[in-house]
Amino acid sequence: MRIVFLFFIFFSFSIQSQTLDYVFKSGEDGYKCFRIPTILKSQNGTLLAFAEGRKNSCSDTGDIDLVLKKSLDNGNTWSALNVIWDDGNNTCGNPSPVLDKKSGRISLLSTWNKGEDKEWQIIDQKVLILGEFF
């Protein structure tokens, strides 16, 4: 019983001492919401946080940009939001950064489709332009 009591005291203290900070927060920087976040640590230690910036809704279709924030202090603070790909009302999504450890080069793989294309149309290949990968 004593061990359980001490566990709860420690657990309660641990929860209370943590602060919660978001890299991307819905409703900020002109975006309704952010989805598909991913973080990569460069060879010089810079953290790069990528996400989809969804302008008008949290839907998987529509005006979606790729956005980036950087941290030089291991995530304690973050830069202002940078838009790295905005193709008007089209969907630029699924950011997937890859680090080449030999060269230090970072490649960002992503997808693109027309903003009015619905998910079921893309899956059934019923769109004029099939999604592109970059």
Predicted features and spans:
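Sec-dependent N-terminal signal peptides
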Residues: 3-13
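Asp-box/BNR beta-propeller blade signature and adjacent active/binding-site loops
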Residues: 16-134
